């Protein structure tokens, strides 16, 4: 994902990123690189840590867990996930409500959130 280019893939009106960012060492860089192929809208659906939301809606943070044998680098809360998209240069960022996706390995499933945004270059068209 760090090496995507318009020469390889062209551009897309919608780029969907699903349960990917938590597995990347630099998720903001990945989102920045995806802007090259994102003509207009970005939709991110990824894991979030509901425990971090308990600190209040203005708290932005992530649980770093690399090195403990898991495949995830970090799991943000909803606010942090939205700020990662903003930091990657997208605009009109909107963070949706938290929801749970059933997963057999965990009781109760895995918390996720959805973020929608636009590539600022689409607004100039």
Task: Report each predicted region and the residues it spans.
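S-adenosyl-L-methionine-dependent methyltransferase catalytic module, highlighting the catalytic core
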Residues: 1-9, 16, 25-123
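Short catalytic micro-motifs in class I SAM-dependent methyltransferases
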Residues: 14-20
